[in-house]
């Protein structure tokens, strides 16, 4: 029998906690036998004194086991259960293509996603733009779609990782969100509760990223890769660029449209293609569905070119309550803004740098994102045709097209977009889409 205050004291004094102490405390978070004040105190003690890798693994697995852990064995799946998670960014629509692409190559992708908050968009919000799509289906329907289609993208259910829900809300109110140890446990407990065989982790770097510096992003990526592999899930973390909007757009309905265009081959943004392929190829390799990266990329290009990935996206949408002809007729179902108008830079030149976070906040200002949890969204608004760094812009080439519901909202977003995209006389040096892969062998 342990005492919560003694566990807090031990961590406050900079000592390592045993896995039994961590399990006891997490159980107390779940059963409410540990108070909010005690949870806040432990969070602050961890923030200042950190946790070693054994402690991080113990915290992650204890939080994973605080609720239901999904079991796929009874479904008799004939392929690996694989997934991807992103730390979030602007125009990060990867999940919508990656899930069906991986499923078309023989994987099963039970993706549990979140809603957007602050400047980052949420995968679930994009699906909420699709009429009828159930982001919170019954567990029976979720399992049925995973088995029959190979991919289902839904929201977190109440019985998954309840400890994280309580711990996170207290961290949010007590300034301990930024702890790498606690971020690692929060992200991975939710993913590992899905009982995955393999995970590709997308850790963003740059002006639109969650972590403020490259060094902090790399530290988080290493922590996630080490803890996930230590907990028994094959995981690779990729460090990817978020110094500009990833897709050509940012919003909800506009990103769904770009995902369909990507899957059908109507338009594939080259940067988006590179990061999607990098993550998806890693999932196939970790899941044993490809022998090397070239093999993985060839398989992925095949399911894009032959239409199989687009077909599975359509089946997932209809399987979860959306229209059966969504891929073919998406424009009939997606909401559209009242005002769709380009914005031009005040000078001609090249898109030199971008404050990606500010562009994400411009979408929030339009009504396409949340200032606080629970805010209602307008799924039609956002930005399209966002220029890429290095693009030449002038009086006839816009830096973006704004989708707004009123002249006032358009004017506010126009100012924000012009301020966020910096124009230079020369093009900037090209930066890679993927900075690094952190595999188990690198740890």
From Swiss-Prot:
Belongs to the thymidine/pyrimidine-nucleoside phosphorylase family. The enzymes which catalyze the reversible phosphorolysis of pyrimidine nucleosides are involved in the degradation of these compounds and in their utilization as carbon and energy sources, or in the rescue of pyrimidine bases for nucleotide synthesis. One of its GO terms (cellular component) is cytosol. Pathway: Pyrimidine metabolism; dTMP biosynthesis via salvage pathway; dTMP from thymine: step 1/2. It comes from the Bacteria. Pfam families: Glycos_trans_3N, Glycos_transf_3, PYNP_C. PANTHER family: THYMIDINE PHOSPHORYLASE. GO terms for molecular function: 1,4-alpha-oligoglucan phosphorylase activity; thymidine phosphorylase activity. PROSITE patterns: THYMID_PHOSPHORYLASE (PS00647). Keywords: Glycosyltransferase, Transferase. Gene3D superfamilies: Nucleoside phosphorylase/phosphoribosyltransferase catalytic domain, Pyrimidine nucleoside phosphorylase-like, C-terminal domain, Transferase, Pyrimidine Nucleoside Phosphorylase, Chain C. Its EC number is 2.4.2.4. The lineage of its organism: Bacteria, Pseudomonadati, Pseudomonadota, Gammaproteobacteria, Alteromonadales. The gene is deoA. One of its GO terms (biological process) is thymidine metabolic process. Homodimer. It catalyses: thymidine + phosphate = 2-deoxy-alpha-D-ribose 1-phosphate + thymine. This is Thymidine phosphorylase. Transmembrane segments: none annotated. The keyword Cell inner membrane does not apply.
């Amino acid at each position: 029998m342990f005492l919560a205050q003694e566990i807090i004291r031990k961590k406050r004094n900079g000592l390592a906690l045993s896995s039994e102490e961590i399990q006891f405390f997490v159980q107390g978070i779940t059963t409410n036998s540990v108070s909010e004040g005690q949870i806040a105190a432990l969070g602050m003690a961890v923030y200042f004194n950190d946790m070693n890798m054994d402690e991080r693994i113990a915290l992650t697995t204890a939080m994973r086991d605080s609720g239901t852990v999904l079991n796929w064995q009874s479904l008799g799946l004939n392929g690996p259960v694989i997934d991807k998670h992103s730390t979030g960014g602007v125009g990060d629509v990867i999940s919508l293509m990656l899930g069906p692409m991986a499923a078309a190559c023989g994987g099963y992708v039970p993706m549990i996603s979140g809603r957007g908050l602050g400047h980052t968009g949420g995968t679930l919000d994009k699906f909420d733009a699709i009429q009828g799509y159930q982001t919170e289906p019954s567990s029976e329907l979720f399992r049925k779609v995973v088995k029959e289609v190979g991919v289902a993208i839904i929201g977190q259910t109440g019985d998954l990782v309840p400890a994280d829900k309580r711990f996170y809300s207290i961290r949010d109110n007590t300034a301990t969100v930024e702890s790498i140890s606690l971020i690692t446990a929060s992200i991975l407990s939710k993913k590992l509760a899905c009982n995955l065989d393999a995970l590709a982790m997308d850790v963003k770097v740059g002006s639109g990223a969650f972590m403020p510096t490259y060094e902090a992003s790399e530290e988080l990526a290493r922590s996630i890769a080490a803890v996930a592999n230590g907990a028994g899930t094959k995981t690779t973390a990729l460090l990817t660029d978020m110094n500009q909007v990833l897709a050509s757009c940012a919003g909800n309905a506009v990103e769904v449209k770009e995902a369909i265009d990507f899957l059908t081959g109507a338009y594939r943004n080259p940067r988006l293609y590179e990061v999607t392929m990098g993550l998806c190829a890693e999932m196939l390799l970790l899941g044993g569905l490809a022998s090397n990266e070239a093999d993985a990329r060839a398989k992925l290009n095949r399911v894009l070119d032959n239409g199989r990935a687009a077909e599975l996206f359509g089946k997932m949408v209809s399987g979860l309550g959306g229209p059966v002809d969504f891929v073919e007729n998406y424009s009939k179902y997606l909401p559209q803004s009242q005002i769709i108008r380009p914005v031009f830079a005040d000078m001609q030149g090249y898109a030199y740098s971008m404050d990606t976070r500010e562009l994400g906040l411009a979408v929030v200002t339009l009504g396409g994102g949340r200032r606080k949890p629970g805010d209602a969204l307008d799924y039609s608004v956002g930005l399209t045709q966002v220029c890429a760094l290095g693009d030449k812009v002038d009086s006839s080439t816009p830096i973006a097209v704004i989708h707004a519901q009123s002249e006032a909202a358009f004017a506010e977003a126009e100012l924000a977009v012009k301020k966020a995209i910096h124009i230079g006389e020369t093009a900037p040096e090209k930066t890679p889409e993927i900075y690094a892969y952190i595999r188990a062998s690198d740890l």
